[in-house]
C-alpha cells in the first residue's frame, strides 16, 4: 500500500510544480503580450514533411496551469477516497492520460492534433465512467461515448473541408471564416463539436449519466477538462461566432440549456446529479456570453468555475464516502453537526456558485450579468439569464436545506465525522482558491477594466434575483410530516422537468427503441401484410385462379360448344334480320 501512496504523492508533487511554473509563465506572457508558435518537424521524407505545431499564449498556459492544479489535488484526494480499491494504480494512470489529452487539446492550433486530444478525452472518459463495473456504469459510458462521437464526426468533417485550403492550422484562417461562406461550414462543424462536448441541448443527457464515474473523476471532468473542452475550442474560434446567425443560434441553445439544467436540479435528489446539472447550467452561461462576443469573460468564468466546482464535487465525495456510498439527499440531514469542516467548505463552494459577493463566482458571474444588461439582447434572452441565475441559488439553498439542516434521516447507528487529512487538504486548498481566486484573476486578466454604468435598480437586480431564488429554494423544500411536498401537486410538470425535458429518453430510446419499433410495425404491416398480400401471395393466388378457371373450360367442352353454337346462331339471325 505504501507504494501506491507514494505513487499518488509523486504525481501530486509533479503536477503541482508544473502548474505553478506554468501560472508564473502565463503571467509573463500576459503582461508582455507574448505568443510563441512552435513547429516541430517529426518526419521529413524527400519533399514531404510531417510537422507538429504548438501555440503558447497566456490563455493556453493559464488554462493548463488550472487543469494541472485541479488534477494534482484530485490525485492527492483519490489517495484516500480510493484507498480500498485494488486498481488504484490503473485509476491514477487513467487520470494522467486524461490530463495529457487535455494538454494536447489546449496547446494545439491545428485541427489534426486537436482531434488527437479530443478523441483521447472521449476514449479515456469512457474508461473512467465504466470504472465501477456494473450495468449502470456500462450504459452511462456507452451514452457518453456515443454522444461525443457526433462531435468527433463533426471535427473530422471540418478537417476534410480544410483540405481545400492547404493547411490544417485553423488559426491562420480565422479572419477568412468570418466572411467566406465555405469557411463558415468549418465554423458550424466546430460549433456542433463544441455543443456535444459541452453537453448543450440536444446532447445534454450524457452529462448527468457520467456521474456513474468515481467522484474524483467527476471533480476533474466536470470542472476543468472534458466538458470545458468545447467552451475552450469555441473561445479559440471566437471570430467565427461574429457571424450573426451562428451567434443567435448558440445564444438560444445555450440559454435554453442553462434554463433546463437549473429547473431540473430543483427536482433532483441525487447529490452528484444536482452538482452535474449545476455544471450544465454554468456551461450554458459560458456558451451564451461567448456567443455575445465576450470571449475573455467566458474564459474568466471558465477558470473561476473550475475552482469552486471541483471543490463542490470533492465535498460531495467526502459526504458520500462517510454515508457509505449513499447519494440521496433525503437520507442526509444535520450533516453540519457531524462534518463541520466539510460542510463549511461545501457552503463556501455553494455561495461561490450563487455569486455571493467577494467569492470567486461573484467576480465572473456578476460581470457577465452586467455586460448582458449593457448589451442589446431581447427580453427572452434577458429572462433566461436572470431566471437561470435565480434557479442556481434556488437549488443550492434546497441542497443545503436537505443535507445540512434538520434531523439526520439515515441509520442512527451510523457514525459520521470529517474525512482524513488527505481529503481535507485538497478540500481546504480549493476552499482558499474559491475565496481568493476570483479577485486574483480579475486583477490579473483585466488590466484596464471596463466602465460599467448602470442605474441603481439594474445594479441591484442580480442581488434581488439571488435573494428571491434563495427564498424559493427554502419554500419548495420545506416539507413536514403533516405537510406534503408541493412538487406532488404538479406531478406531470415535475416528471417533465425532473427528467431534463425527457432528453435522456429521447437520446436513448428515441434513437434506438422507437426506430426499431417503427421498423417492426412496418415489417408487420408491409412485408408481412399488404406487400405480401398484393405481392408474392396475390400473384400466386391469381395465377392459380386463372388456371382453375381455364381448366373448367377444358373439362366442360360439350357444354361450351353447344353454348357457343347457340350464341353464334342468335348473332347470325340478328344480322339477317337487320340486313332485310
Swiss-Prot record:
Membrane topology: Multi-pass membrane protein
InterPro entries reported for this sequence: NADH_DH_su5_C, ND/Mrp_TM, NU5C-like, Proton_antipo_N
Main subcellular location: mitochondrion
EC code: 7.1.1.2
Source species, domain of life: Eukaryota
Outcome reported for the amino acid change (mutating residue 377 to M): In haplotype 24
Catalytic activity: a ubiquinone + NADH + 5 H(+)(in) = a ubiquinol + NAD(+) + 4 H(+)(out)
Transmembrane segments: 12-32, 50-70, 92-112, 113-133, 153-173, 183-203, 215-235, 244-264, 274-293, 298-320, 343-363, 367-387, 427-447, 463-483, 496-516, 560-580
Documented effect of changing residue 116 to S: In strain: Muheza
Keyword Transmembrane in record: yes
Example of a GO MF term: NADH dehydrogenase (ubiquinone) activity
Result of changing residue 32 to T: In strain: GMMK6
Signal sequence bounds: none
Keywords (A to Z) from UniProt: Electron transport, Membrane, Mitochondrion, Mitochondrion inner membrane, NAD, Respiratory chain, Translocase, Transmembrane, Transmembrane helix, Transport, Ubiquinone
Cellular compartment(s): Mitochondrion inner membrane
GO CC terms in record: mitochondrial inner membrane; respiratory chain complex I
Pfam families: NADH5_C, Proton_antipo_M, Proton_antipo_N
GO biological process: ATP synthesis coupled electron transport; electron transport coupled proton transport
General function of this protein: Core subunit of the mitochondrial membrane respiratory chain NADH dehydrogenase (Complex I) that is believed to belong to the minimal assembly required for catalysis. Complex I functions in the transfer of electrons from NADH to the respiratory chain. The immediate electron acceptor for the enzyme is believed to be ubiquinone.
Entry similarity comment: Belongs to the complex I subunit 5 family.
Name of this chain's protein: NADH-ubiquinone oxidoreductase chain 5
Gene: mt:ND5
